[in-house]
Amino acid sequence: MNQTIKAKLELLPDSPGCYLHKDKNGTVIYVGKAKNLKNRVRSYFHGSHNTKTELLVSEIEDLEWIVVGSNIESLVLEINLIQRYKPKYNIMLKDDKYYPFLKITNEKYPRLLVVRKVQKDGATYFGPYPDVKAANEVKRLLDRIFPFRKCGLHEKKVCFYFHIHQCLCPVVNHVDPQVFKDMTQEVKEFLTGSDKKIVNELEAKMMVSSDNMEFEQAAEYRDVIKAIGTLRTKQRVMNQDLKDRDVFGYYVDKGWMCVQVFFVRQGKLIQRDVNMFPYYNDAEEDFLTYIGQFYQDNNHMMPREIFIPQDIDKESVEAVVAASQEGNLLTKAQAKEVDAKVFTAKTLKFSDQKDVEQSIVKLDKELSAEKRLSSLLAKTQIVQPSRGEKKQLVNMATKNAQSQLQLKFDVAERDILKTTKAVENLGKILGIPKPVRIESFDNSNIMGTSPVSAMVVFIDGKPSKKDYRKYKIKTVVGADDYASMREVMTRRYSRALKEETALPDLIAMDGGAGQVNITKQVLKELGLSIPVAGMQKNDKHQTSELLFGDPLDVVPLSRQSQEFFLLTRIQDEVHRFAITFHRQLRGKNTFSSKLDGIVGLGPKRKQKLLTTFKNLKAIEEASVQEVAEADIPYEVAERVKTTLSGPIQENENWESLKDNVPLLEGKK
């Protein structure tokens, strides 16, 4: 805990509000709410915590807080702040999970579509459906009954669907728009279970067609009636009142929460939504946050009723639902004001003369959620069933949440057992003690520029990211992989000896005999005896074989074994870590070329120079005419020569310049 945090902990009020934890870069990494800010925030820095919370606390370098008037206000504000800052330790709903809906467009001559997103466009939506197949099945049936527009608005003749009675071609046939309004209402009635009227009409039409000996048309009506019956059978009716409901259940265990949502539409259970995540707050409070985020997503349509368990505060759920129905938890103006208040707090001075930002901020009264409840809750009711079928629905959601969470733990436990066994077996195969700690190294550079190396550490078969290390190559010029590895191994294990830090049980090099032998030489020079293996790749850059022993030999390992999978994970991870570091370093090392800023010399003409000359010195030594022959206008060539007449920067080379020239369209 640093001095800034210590000072701020003394300022914490006994009020409800929200707090924001930040990392060393000032990035918000966690947003929480509390009935008592002083007690809640201080609890992070005192006492013992589980592993997840300890990881969060280890990254906290600063904190802010916002004081509000009530617990409900803090709940509403917390959800807004999470959506705004997207902290990595908060619950974040998956944004790639869109269920399909049926949509009747808000047009003069509307269309019937299957879509994945609900928008505020005045259209009529039905759903969600469990998958696209189910939505399309309903749409195909509706198309056979209700001939919504399928053609364009500028057609001059009827379309194909007109001939099969699935489109009225309203533009060509000048259909009254009221016809479509009536059809839309009939679709609403049909999808809410009132299909008896439609079936009766179809049966009457079937009889008329049969009497008129129009047997094909009669068969079509018969098939549609049969399809309606089939669809009705597939959808189990959960409640006879046919209301749209979302049923929530949750379960917590071992620091994890699972939330199950059952979608009940027209009394039928059609789908469920499952989310599992670690929670750092009180379980009930994190569940409330989840509900708020759930309905802030426009893809989740607000139902007529929301069922929640008995142990959840109904008033708080009403607050977040009301805020979501309103469209935004805060208006843009209010959100900007919150930002200004959080990050423009007053400064206090303490006895140690250190300035510490005072972060007690009052939220304006207009954010009060209670004032909005009466009008907004008329649309959606929050229900806590106490008996009967409705109570059974909530219990079923809760039991499913428990089952899913237990399944996650069972799978994770099996994976741990497999990984632990793989580590033990790897030691037996190599004839060494169990390699609890494995360190792996890899180099990365392009044409010798920005050479780096990286080390990853696996403990008991799992990555220990706090032990990862990055190395900038200091003593090697150009692309010398072996010399770079010698430098890194010397630096790593000299320091380990000096500081008496943990040494690995096995070093797994990303490479073959060359890298292994260099590592062995360095270890011998340092007086260390650590087993070294080489993870060799094939021409497809995939883990191919394990080299070990003296002399080195290929260790027979099945590609389907857990030991081989472990080595593959280690090799992939060290390669990823090294190349990511290299890209970061290259980005920092970019510079402005002497060719930048020359009037008339844009990216395309720089590319032409790049393909004609090897380096800047070659351009400098060329004549104006030779530069112009590279398809550069003569006056621009003159400016190039004039600019390059000065000394070339020492660190400027053509490979670096090449990185700064955008590729021409179509070139690779």
Swiss-Prot record:
Function, as annotated: The UvrABC repair system catalyzes the recognition and processing of DNA lesions. UvrC both incises the 5' and 3' sides of the lesion. The N-terminal half is responsible for the 3' incision and the C-terminal half is responsible for the 5' incision.
GIY-YIG domain sequence ranges: 14-91
One Pfam family recorded for the sequence: GIY-YIG
Gene3D superfamilies per the UniProt record, alphabetical: 5' to 3' exonuclease, C-terminal subdomain, GIY-YIG endonuclease, UVR domain, UvrC, RNAse H endonuclease domain
GO biological process: nucleotide-excision repair; SOS response
Superkingdom: Bacteria
Family in the record: Belongs to the UvrC family.
Domain UVR: 196-231
Keywords: Cytoplasm, DNA damage, DNA excision, DNA repair, Excision nuclease, SOS response
Assembly and interaction partners: Interacts with UvrB in an incision complex.
Compartments where found: Cytoplasm
Gene Ontology molecular function: DNA binding; excinuclease ABC activity
Lineage summary: Bacteria, Bacillati, Bacillota, Bacilli, Lactobacillales
Protein name per UniProt: UvrABC system protein C
SUPFAM superfamilies: C-terminal UvrC-binding domain of UvrB, GIY-YIG endonuclease, RuvA domain 2-like
GO cellular component terms, semicolon-separated: cytoplasm; excinuclease repair complex
Gene that encodes it: uvrC
